[in-house]
């Protein structure tokens, strides 16, 4: 609760100043924009058949017929073409319609059949190559087979460079059922013919695709590895190249490895890392058959199935295919090799204590452990319970002699014989065992202090106690903590009146000295300029109310007019009108001004 501050105006006609409040508004932060990016679906590519040039390279220079040339045969199949008459005659082409002017007298029937046979042979070689090779194996550029045709073609800008396959980016290698748009080898394909009167088309490389691309999002390389089938063999010949794939390298599955323990080879380059994970693979799809690598398979590490270190067996899939460990591990003593199911240890057998005379029994562990051996065996709660049960049964079957007093709580041995034991803290001890926990002095017949079932002599117990921050003596009884220190209750007093502050509110000055509330206000409270007494809170209050005027402090009851003694306040005509440093009311202020004016006029 703050005190009122009453400051008198300098003149009666002076208006009271008004403090305007300024409200600052902090501009709110703009909402963040969210950009959502979606993955575009790849376009679907279809087989494209390039238009054939109008010029016929097989036409004689003096002939008049316009026949489209057949596609050039591949380089690999040029050796198979021996002569024109070596091919079987094609079926009649009565249903083929041509939109060009043909001169039947230009070529013989045998020449026409030879031209069609060459085209059929080219298509046959293409289909045979499609069935025997990987769809993503790059084909050798067949530029030599069309050099003669490109050299004699008039008005062309790009020569026919051969058959090129369509490259589909960002797709995984697929070795599956081929979906080809070409017809069977026994059916000739219709030949597209350019009509007369149109512009001459520019010849482009004849492109074809081995499989239709499904309209699916591109495969993500970072996918979970599918479990390969051990009996699956990839179609076609097995290439010898495997490893990391480059932009221009063919994809091939690795060859079969010997049945020895081998490491799993990643098909993609992998940088140095700290945790090995199986290489990413592609999920199996209905229309594609994935050719897995013939390597050893290992699932990713899961905490509940064992680790990859030498002390744990890796998790193996339960199948007829024998999977060998990916990493050779050294077996420890008493542990099954990795990959084999380790049966739990045999049931614990307990060796009973020997039946002897009342001889001191040694606490020993006669239980074989099923886990790994350790240098410091520790009792589990159930083992300790069984051990005590056996001891009790042994004591019941072998009652002690008349001099038996019990079992020592310190060493666990029997206390036998008169004068060899003592009783303390409701327990039995040997005389030699009942000693101080710090100085090991015998405590029989001596005063001791029991702390948590442990015995201490008086000097050692006192040394463990806290000391009072005032008298520096150990606190034997109740401890009073304040300001982070420990005190005796009678040492925690006010520095002014020396009264004990046990249970009484107190405060601390800047020097850390403890004061009661009254003495603190008497020492540090502001003084009234009229009565010179400290301005303290009213009885029962915690806050101090004072009046500040002319840079001076006043009690509420001491803020009065110096001439008439009237109580000043903030009411109308009751305020303070100071004059020459005096606290005056309005009436007394006017009277003093008139007296001073009259005196000045008489002096003149």
UniProtKB/Swiss-Prot annotation:
GO terms for molecular function: metal ion binding. Keywords: Activator, Cell adhesion, Cell junction, Cytoplasm, LIM domain, Metal-binding, Nucleus, Repeat, Zinc. The keyword Nucleus applies. Residues 31-96, 129-381 are annotated as: Disordered. It holds the Pfam family LIM. GO terms for biological process: cell-cell adhesion. The keyword Ion transport does not apply. GO terms for cellular component: cytoplasm; focal adhesion; nucleus; stress fiber. This is Lipoma-preferred partner homolog. It comes from Gallus gallus (Chicken).
């Amino acid at each position: 609760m703050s005190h009122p501050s009453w400051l008198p105006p300098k003149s009666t006609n002076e208006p009271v100043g008004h403090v305007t409040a300024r409200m600052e508004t902090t501009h709110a932060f703009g909402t963040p924009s969210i950009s959502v990016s979606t993955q575009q679906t790849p376009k679907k590519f279809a087989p494209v058949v390039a238009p054939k040039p109008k010029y016929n390279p097989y036409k004689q220079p003096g002939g008049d017929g316009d026949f489209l040339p057949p596609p050039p045969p591949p380089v690999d199949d040029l050796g198979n073409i021996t002569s024109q008459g070596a091919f079987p005659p094609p079926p009649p082409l009565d249903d083929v319609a041509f939109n060009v002017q043909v001169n039947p007298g230009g070529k013989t029937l045998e020449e026409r059949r030879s031209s069609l046979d060459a085209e059929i042979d080219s298509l046959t070689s293409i289909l045979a190559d499609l069935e025997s090779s990987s769809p993503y194996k790059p084909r050798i550029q067949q530029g030599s087979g069309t050099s003669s045709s490109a050299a004699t073609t008039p008005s062309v800008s790009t020569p026919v460079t051969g058959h090129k396959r369509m490259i589909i980016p960002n797709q995984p290698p697929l070795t599956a059922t081929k979906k080809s748009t070409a017809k069977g080898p026994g059916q000739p394909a219709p030949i597209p013919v350019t009509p007369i009167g149109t512009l001459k088309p520019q010849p482009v490389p004849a492109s074809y695709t081995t499989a239709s691309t499904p309209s699916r999002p591109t495969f993500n390389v970072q996918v979970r590895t599918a479990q390969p089938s051990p009996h699956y063999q990839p179609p076609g010949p097995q290439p010898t190249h495997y490893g990391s794939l480059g932009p221009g390298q063919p994809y091939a599955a690795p060859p079969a490895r010997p049945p020895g323990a081998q490491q799993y080879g990643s098909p993609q380059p992998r940088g140095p890392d700290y945790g090995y994970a199986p290489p990413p693979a592609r999920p199996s799809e209905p229309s594609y058959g994935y050719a897995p690598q013939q390597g050893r398979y290992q699932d990713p590490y899961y905490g509940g199935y064992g680790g990859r270190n030498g002390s744990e067996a890796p998790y193996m899939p339960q199948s007829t295919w024998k999977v060998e460990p990916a990493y050779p591990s050294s077996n420890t003593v008493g542990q099954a090799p990795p990959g084999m199911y380790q049966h739990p240890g045999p049931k614990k057998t307990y060796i009973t204590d020997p039946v002897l005379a009342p001889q001191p029994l040694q606490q020993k562990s006669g239980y074989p452990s099923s886990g790994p051996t350790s240098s410091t065996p520790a009792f589990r709660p159930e083992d300790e319970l069984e051990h005590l049960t056996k001891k009790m049964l042994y004591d019941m079957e072998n009652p002690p002699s008349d001099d038996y007093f019990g079992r020592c709580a310190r060493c666990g041995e029997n206390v036998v014989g008169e004068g060899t034991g003592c009783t303390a803290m409701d327990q039995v001890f040997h005389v030699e065992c009942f000693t101080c926990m710090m100085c090991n002095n015998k405590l029989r017949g001596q005063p001791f202090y029991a702390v948590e079932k442990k015995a201490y002599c008086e000097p050692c117990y006192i040394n463990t106690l806290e000391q009072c921050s005032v008298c520096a003596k150990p606190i034997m009884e109740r401890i009073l903590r304040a300001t982070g220190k420990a005190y005796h209750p009678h040492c925690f007093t006010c520095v002014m009146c020396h009264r004990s502050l046990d249970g009484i509110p107190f405060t601390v000055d800047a020097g850390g000295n403890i004061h009661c509330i009254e003495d603190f206000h008497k020492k540090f409270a502001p003084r009234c300029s009229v009565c010179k007494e400290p301005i303290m809170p009213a009885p029962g209050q915690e806050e101090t109310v004072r009046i500040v005027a002319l840079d001076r402090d006043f009690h509420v009851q001491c803020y009065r007019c110096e001439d008439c003694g009237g109580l000043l306040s903030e009411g109308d005509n009751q305020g303070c009108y100071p004059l020459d440093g005096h606290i005056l009311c309005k009436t007394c202020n006017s009277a003093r001004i008139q007296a001073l004016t009259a005196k000045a006029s008489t002096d003149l």
